[in-house]
Swiss-Prot record:
GO terms for biological process: urea catabolic process. GO terms for cellular component: urease complex. It comes from Burkholderia lata (strain ATCC 17760 / DSM 23089 / LMG 22485 / NCIMB 9086 / R18194 / 383). This is Urease subunit beta. The keyword Nucleotide-binding does not apply. It is found in: Cytoplasm.
Amino acid sequence: MIPGEILTDDGEHVLNAGRATLTLVVANTGDRPVQVGSHYHFFEVNDALSFDRAAARGFRLNIAAGTAVRFEPGQTRTVELVALAGDRAVYGFQGKVMGPL
């Protein structure tokens, strides 16, 4: 075994199966790239990203853990979000929630 190695069963693995998802169109209106990590509360991302922010409350990017999506200046792209799990409480980030969703 290699440190950090993950051994899985053969076959296809579905991430976030059975969880609510949401598709949004996101535009970077700023003059600098914005990168958003896999577990960042999307409602609280950089204000230069323009999208239906209220709809994104309680969601994160539906991508593999440890990865990110980069939005270049002026770029518009469609992303899929997945509902946060666990206690559904959010603390930190930009401090816009600081408690249960």
